[in-house]
């Protein structure tokens, strides 16, 4: 799942690079121009701007659900502020306190270092010119 989400965020960054430069997705009719130009998230001031490292979105919030058949689905790609990032941290902390036995025998990826990793990621991003 992690590899797929990384691939998805890379694709979203490639899309933003295109929309703010060559606009090939619009020219090829893949995305109707009115969808782009009327979007509240589109900023014409960014046209022609290449951000440091070519990365437009440093943080992404992917809303996922799992179907009854076990298949995972992405409901939404959120490239704005990851407002829900703290919810899993608090939920996992409560789960560890209430049912610590669940975490002993199951490989659950630890999420407590998320704030540090986010800070490290943002600090390693080149400053804007």
Predicted regions and their residues:
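Preference for protein termini
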Residues: 1-129
